[in-house]
């Protein structure tokens, strides 16, 4: 069972190796305009080897296509398009919110878990 989430923006095995098996890795690279699928698959393979769940930020369609454990929807994403997608039962969607309006948005997006935080403001 995942109890902690660790955000990464690059593939660094040193940081991933420090995580225990109750930690899921969330890859979010907002600095790059182009999504590097090969890098994502590399991280996925490494996480699988370490028995860690792996989530992709802000791209549910690609997370489904690459058969990841799930996707993370940041608080600024209000899109509902993913509700039309079909995905495996074990595919999880998680999101973050900073206030009641964003919590309601995440509920409308049918996320499985919501991070409540003001840390990112």
Where are these regions (language model features)?
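Contiguous, function-dense segments enriched for cysteine-driven chemistry
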Residues: 100, 116-121
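Conserved N-terminal beta1-alpha1 strand-loop-helix module at the mouth
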Residues: 1-80, 85-112
């Amino acid at each position: 069972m995942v109890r902690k989430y660790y955000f990464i923006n690059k593939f660094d095995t040193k940081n991933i190796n420090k995580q225990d098996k109750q930690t899921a890795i969330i890859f979010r690279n907002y600095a790059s305009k182009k999504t590097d699928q090969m890098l994502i698959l590399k991280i996925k393979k490494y996480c699988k080897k370490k028995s860690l769940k792996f989530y992709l930020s802000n791209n549910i369609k690609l997370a489904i296509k690459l058969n990841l454990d799930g996707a993370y929807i940041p608080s600024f994403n209000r899109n509902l398009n993913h509700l039309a997608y079909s995905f495996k039962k074990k595919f999880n969607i998680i999101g973050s919110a900073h206030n009641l309006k964003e919590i309601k948005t995440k509920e409308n997006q049918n996320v499985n878990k919501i991070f409540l935080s003001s840390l990112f403001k």
